[in-house]
Amino acid sequence: MIHNPILQTSLDFLHLMATIAWIGGMFFNFLVVMPTVAKVLDPATAGRFVGALMKRVRVVVYVSLLILFVTGIPMKIANENYVAIISFENAWQIAGFIKHVFVGLMAVLAFYSFEILTPSVVKLSAQGPSPAITTLRKRQMMIAAATTFLFGIIVIFLSAVMKYL
């Protein structure tokens, strides 16, 4: 246990803020930004806009991941249910392992989206409409749907479950 309530509260606060920034940003991007961009902007402008937006979002996501990592380790170790880094001795450890698998998958998909997919979309969008850009945008939406709604909700749900185990 962390016996210093100020430290414990600070770690929890930073952890929650990073979670809100990352997963909340994904929800907003998927539900508001991407549909609006697709409806309002021509492909070339949409590509430039998404490229510029993702440069900023990427920083938020990577900083959030760093904060989650730095705050999550002491919070996990200090929890009374903690046994080992990887342990399946109690329900809390199992839920935590599953949650972190999904967080890892979300991080990998975010990296793929920011470093591989978005630059390709920006490059192709500059050339105008094409079947390739349509395919990449569908892949972008599929990743956003999977990470935002499925994985993000699973992570938040498992976090809530872990509070009561």
Q: What are the language-model segments listed below?
A:
Residues 1-165:
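Polytopic transmembrane helical bundles with strong interfacial aromatic enrichment
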